[in-house]
């Protein structure tokens, strides 16, 4: 389509604006005709609100799905994954198989989690089974480590309840909802420090599901060496990897920002644990991401004007088992280091190359499966249409940690690489 793209954003970040200007796009206000709006989650709520009566035209696209929170709100993500497991179980899917103790063999990738106040009685029952465990409490709708704390006694929850002016956990209240999850107290450590992975995943459509993994993810390290000691439960520099918290620590390094690239992690693990187990670990991480997206796909409003770049947070335990901690709808575009700035600029550049082909005025009927040469540092993680064409046999061969058979873990079809083609 002829003409220049008219853009708007309510997120004033240089990595965004520089990418728009590089393309020769024209900045306008939200009250003018626009084609591309990179917006906050608060704004997307208003845009798709029934009350506003706003309707997007065919030449407008935005960077969030209307109900992205089905994946990015901590309580709803867990709820959808639990529902997904039960549906697979009901269908008799081999993916829902359990071991003798009742644990899922292939879908056990989220720590045991309860919603508070709704699931308080269920939580107490579980807590009493293993009273020496540590649990982590998080507000459902906050980010950057805000409002998070660890507990190892029921009395701590009761105190929190009183402090929050909540009379009872048994009934629903107007107070802020929390999730409480079993704390992964045996994290893989490097240099004695806990870390997590921040991985970027772009979804162009949920039905059919098509998603892309960004190759340049990174690890975020704590500044203080890890200890499971109860005396350090309140020390968030030991337990939380969020840069928003760690940058206030005495030992925070402003040059590298306490970060490693995922490629460096891979090389480290290959040299210390071996290539085979490292490959298996990354296969399982890809598996987790695809299954989490499949879990929310049926309830996601797959609006044709939308795409979304998510920030996945994964923790690896000392047995090299990956755990999905949460998914962020607005991964930080703030640059804490020079390398960070380059990474995030390239992330936005590659995202725009897929979402707005050739930098031209968008068409909501855009080709959501672009050719490989425009992907940049993205790789196709899962393409439902290709996977369906591969038959049910792949479902049985592609469970995490198992060989994918003679085809391997990569399927090349029509010039596109599919990293994981799990059914």
UniProtKB/Swiss-Prot annotation:
InterPro entries: TTL/TTLL_fam. It is an enzyme of class 6 (ligase). L-glutamate binds at residues 220, 259, 344. It comes from the Eukaryota. It is found in: Cytoplasm, Cytoskeleton; Cytoplasm, Cytoskeleton, Cilium basal body; Cytoplasm, Cytoskeleton, Cilium axoneme; Cell projection, Cilium, Flagellum. The keyword Ligase applies. ATP binds at residues 138, 144-145, 181-184, 194-196, 241-242. GO terms for molecular function: ATP binding; metal ion binding; protein-glutamic acid ligase activity, elongating; tubulin binding; tubulin-glutamic acid ligase activity. Residues 391-423 are annotated as: Disordered. Its EC number is 6.3.2.-. A protein binds at residue 144. Belongs to the tubulin polyglutamylase family. Part of the neuronal tubulin polyglutamylase complex which contains TPGS1, TPGS2, TTLL1, LRRC49 and NICN1. Interacts with PCM1, CSTPP1 and LRRC49. This is Polyglutamylase complex subunit TTLL1. The gene is TTLL1.
């Amino acid at each position: 389509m002829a003409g220049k793209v008219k853009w708007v954003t309510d997120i004033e970040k240089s990595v965004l604006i520089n990418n728009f200007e590089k393309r020769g796009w024209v900045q306008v206000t939200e009250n003018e005709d626009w084609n591309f709006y990179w917006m906050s989650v608060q704004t997307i709520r208003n845009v798709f609100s029934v009350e506003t009566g706003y309707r997007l035209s065919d030449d407008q696209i935005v960077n969030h799905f209307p109900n992205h929170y089905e994946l990015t709100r901590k309580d709803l993500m867990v709820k959808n994954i639990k529902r997904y497991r039960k549906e697979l179980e009901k269908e008799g899917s081999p993916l829902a198989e359990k071991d003798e103790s009742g644990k899922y063999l292939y879908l056990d990738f989220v720590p045991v989690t309860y919603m508070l106040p709704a699931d308080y009685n269920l939580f107490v029952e579980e807590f009493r089974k293993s009273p020496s465990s540590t649990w982590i409490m998080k507000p459902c709708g906050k980010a950057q480590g805000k409002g998070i704390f660890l507990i190892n006694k029921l009395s701590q929850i009761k105190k929190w309840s009183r402090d929050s002016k909540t009379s009872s956990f048994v009934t629903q209240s107007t107070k802020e909802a929390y999730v409480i999850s079993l704390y992964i107290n045996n994290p893989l450590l490097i240099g004695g420090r806990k870390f997590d992975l921040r991985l970027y995943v772009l979804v162009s459509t949920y039905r059919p599901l098509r998603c892309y993994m960004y190759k340049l993810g990174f690890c975020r390290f704590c500044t203080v060496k890890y200890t499971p000691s109860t005396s350090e439960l309140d020390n968030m520099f030991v337990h939380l990897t969020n840069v928003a918290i760690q940058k206030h620590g005495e030992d925070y390094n402003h040059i590298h920002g306490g970060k490693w690239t995922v490629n460096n992690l891979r090389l480290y693990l290959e040299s210390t644990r071996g290539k085979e187990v490292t490959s298996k670990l990354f296969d399982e991480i890809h598996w987790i991401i695809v299954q989490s997206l499949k879990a929310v796909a049926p309830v996601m409003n797959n609006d044709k004007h939308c795409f979304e770049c998510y920030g996945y947070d994964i923790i690896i335990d000392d047995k090299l088992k990956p755990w999905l901690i949460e998914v962020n709808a607005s991964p930080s575009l703030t640059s804490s280091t020079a390398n960070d700035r380059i990474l995030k600029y390239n992330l936005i550049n590659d995202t725009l190359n897929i979402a707005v082909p050739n930098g031209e005025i968008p068409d909501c009927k855009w080709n959501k499966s672009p050719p490989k040469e425009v992907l940049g540092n993205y790789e196709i993680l899962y393409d439902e249409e290709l996977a369906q064409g591969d038959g049910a046999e792949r479902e049985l061969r592609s469970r995490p940690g198992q060989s994918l058979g003679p085809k391997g873990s990569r399927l090349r079809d029509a010039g596109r690489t599919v990293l994981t083609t799990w059914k």
